[in-house]
Amino acid sequence: MRSYRSIFSPATAQERAQNFEDYWLYTRQNDGEIIEDQKDLTRKRELRARFEAKAVRSRKPLADPECFYRNCVKMQDGPQTLDRKTLLLTFLYKFARHEWVGISAAWEATAPMAESMRTTQRISRYHLSEEFCHIRLFQEMFRTFHLDRVEWVPLAPWMQRIYSIFPLFPGELMSPPAFVSELLGLTVYLHLDKALDDILAQEPEAREHVRQLLREIMADELAHVGQRRNFLGPVGLRVAKLIVGPMYRTFFRDLPEAKFLFDIDQMVRDGKGFDYSLIAPELLKRSWVPSYCRA
């Protein structure tokens, strides 16, 4: 059995350069061709069509769907008053909304494929297209629970501004928080995957449909973590390790549902101690891991 190392394992500049080429090969094989004007990818589109052809709908719709719509953008009711299924879905919306805002800003700031001369530029365009595909999978999760009126809306103006200027930072400044952001996303998905068994215990069909959608996202996100790690030199890696805790806690403070669903302290520990050996083998087989994180 293959063994793995920590995501914070050191790497030489030469190793990182080769890993960018390896990742570029992997992502093209995994995604197919980019459909740039639609922020889509051919193989992801085919996958989505298969999910939609075998769509599952909850046998027990939310008791009060309007409670979801009322609280998904901003929590209007006390989170402790929401049932756990609704709480999970309002959290998922808020989390995905941050993703949508961030990738929308980054898309405008990155060069289109026709102007992308470097491998890292082409990787970034594919990466963002994958993230837009994830947003479409989130939509299918909501439809699983008969929530057909979900729309993505902007964040508060000051937060929108932060997301809009972040992609303009020099790489040395942007790379550590960009890496930690990907690590945070993967941490959320891993904890969410575990929570499904409890929260959706009475709905096995819906639970497994959501889990399949989630694991498609997780396979990509696992690769994104390695890819973003590859942008970090020794100094950037040290900075990233220092900001895991502050970034995680700051992010979750903006999502009031989080502390009612997850152990935030454990999520921080998982981020700081992330090791590929803790990931399920079937997920690792479908994803990409930097060579310097493989023993």
Predicted feature locations:
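Non-heme di-metal
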Residues: 1-295
